[in-house]
Amino acid sequence: MVIRAVVFDIGGVLEITPDLGLDRRWETRLGLPDGEILARMRDIWRGGSIGTITLDDVHEALRDRLGLDHQKVAQYMADLWREYLGTANTEPIEYARRLRPRYHTGIVSNSFVGAREREQAAY
């Protein structure tokens, strides 16, 4: 079989995405017990990862479920994107570049709603 294309994942492969403790910091800030943000937002995180909701839906849920005002939603989302986007993993990115034009290259991801635009801008 002849290999004609190579496909890469983004999170954890082309991006280094360590856990920066986003929810723990915000739970402390909001006076919530550990795990409470996930408990309240689980269906929203799922919907955002499979594309069944919009970024506006995420913002609305953060306001309604966590009691955040517009400014705090913006702060939370800025923290979320910092953690979610991580940093470029330059070694596999350079490897992917070297494969072209001999092979078709592609990226597959279950990126969260709104992430694609930020990933394209960052990388």
Model regions: which residues?
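Short beta-strand/turn micro-motifs composed of small residues
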Residues: 109
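Short amphipathic alpha-helical segments and helix-helix/interface helices
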Residues: 92-97
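Short, intrinsically disordered, charge-balanced linker/junction segments flanking boundaries
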Residues: 119-123
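N-terminal helical cap/lid subdomain that shapes the substrate entry/recognition surface
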Residues: 2-90, 101, 112-117
